[in-house]
Amino acid sequence: MLENLSTEHRNEKTMNLDEMSIKEILQSMNEEDRTVALAVENEIEQIEKVVQTVIKSFEEEGRLIYIGAGTSGRLGILDAVECPPTFGTDDKMVQGFIAGGLKAFTKAVEGAEDREELADEDLKSIGLNEKDTVIGIAASGRTPYVIGGLKYANRVGASTASISCNKNAEISKYAKINVEVGTGAEILTGSTRLKAGTAQKLVLNMISTASMIGVGKVYKNLMVDVQSTNEKLVERSKRIIVEATGVSYEVAAEYYEKAERNVKAAIVMVLLQCEYGEALQKLKEAKGFVKKAL
């Protein structure tokens, strides 16, 4: 029942929200937002287990699949679509599904989140299998679409995890690993796009970033698998080579082109003074880890 969910409770500090000045509203929001990172901190051990599971999927050429409805679904898609430009993944490695399909990203699809079978259809469409990890996201922790997706994932043998913002969440019953971030009452009662949404975004940032580091997508703290899809990213790629190797910008630009715009290969070529083909071979043997290739 909704009344039992902490995310649906009224916030005692904001009973007079409609009488506050603009500055007071903003200060109240900021004060509440400060509690979110602390709530996430309490779940670090559970998030670590999720990351370990996702890394295992990636190592077995499996995928990370987010499922959610409304804000939760949008946040999953947002995290998924940032992975290709940031980490050089293909668009299948991390995917997000939202109840009602992609059209629901910009406009609510009535009743979609209440249908478990829609998640079945979405996950069947990508051939979900035992190598994959499915993460169900629901602030309330009770969304039928998410529950349906987790049930289906369990049936096909995929790994499962859940992210909710209520303790003892319903979706936790259907996932092997549960992240329950207790964000509490929102300043605007029941508006879980606020603190709950912020918490979910923080957790998703952690999962995707730490998992990508775990499969060699990062050297030191540099995103060496960045895809140069625009001028800004081309410049960033050259700067990454400068930072990683200590060479001048001009030398970095030269090796960037010699390496066919492969930042990892360029770094290995500079530091080991080898040819492009040899750099690729070393990276292959090191399973993509620059540090091991060196």
Curated annotation (Swiss-Prot):
The UniProt entry, under SUPFAM superfamilies, shows: SIS domain
Q: Which InterPro entries match?
A: Etherase_MurQ, Glucokinase_regulatory_CS, MURQ/GCKR, SIS_dom, SIS_dom_sf
Alphabetic keyword roster: Carbohydrate metabolism, Lyase
- Enzyme class of the recorded protein, top EC level: lyase
Active-site residues are: 82 (proton donor), 113
Biochemical pathway: Amino-sugar metabolism; N-acetylmuramate degradation
Q: Which cysteines are joined by disulfide bonds?
A: none
Instruction: List the EC numbers from the record.
Output: 4.2.1.126
State the HAMAP family in the record. Answer: MurQ
Which family does this protein fall into? Belongs to the GCKR-like family. MurNAc-6-P etherase subfamily.
Query: Please, what other remarks does the record include?
Result: A lyase-type mechanism (elimination/hydration) is suggested for the cleavage of the lactyl ether bond of MurNAc 6-phosphate, with the formation of an alpha,beta-unsaturated aldehyde intermediate with (E)-stereochemistry, followed by the syn addition of water to give product.
Put simply, this protein is called N-acetylmuramic acid 6-phosphate etherase
Q: Which organism is this protein's natural source? A: Bacillus cereus (strain ATCC 10987 / NRS 248)
